[in-house]
Amino acid sequence: MEVDNSDLMGLVNEIIPFHMKHNAEPEAVDLLIEVERLDILADHVTKENHARTCLYLFSCSSYLPEPEDAEVLKVAHAIFMKVEKYTEAMRVACRLGVQETMEETFNAAEDKLVRRQMCYMLARHGHPLKLDEGPCEVTDGDELEELQTIMSNSNLSANYLTLARDLDVMEAKLPEDI
């Protein structure tokens, strides 16, 4: 017996915009997960409410079974890409573990500093990209060398020492010194 759910979807289409406009993003996400229509969430997300929405999606994915968790993460990735938050999108792509998604995210970012940050993230998660060929090819020789160095973690120890010097924590301190 097939159930006509057009009335239900009509109500959902009225409730979701209301929740998204009135800071009830988790309720909207829960409702869409329940009716299995999470795909329409991206249409209602704006720059103002994307952070709470994606944080909730990212948190929910840990508690969902195998195929549903990936769907939730894909929606979070799509929202981050829509609002041009590429480093957050890369964090979600690393959690998904899909090479094509990581490549798409890397290619979307044009800012060199954002690309450097993404290379640090990819190196940390153990997902190196081929930057000298393929879909993520970097044509600038200096940038290519720098990004490959970052992705190989070859300067990681030196970077930690620089951070320790900047924070002035190279030497142990007594409570009186602080």
Regions found by a protein language model. Give the residues of each.
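Extended alpha-helical assembly domains of large eukaryotic scaffold proteins
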Residues: 1-178
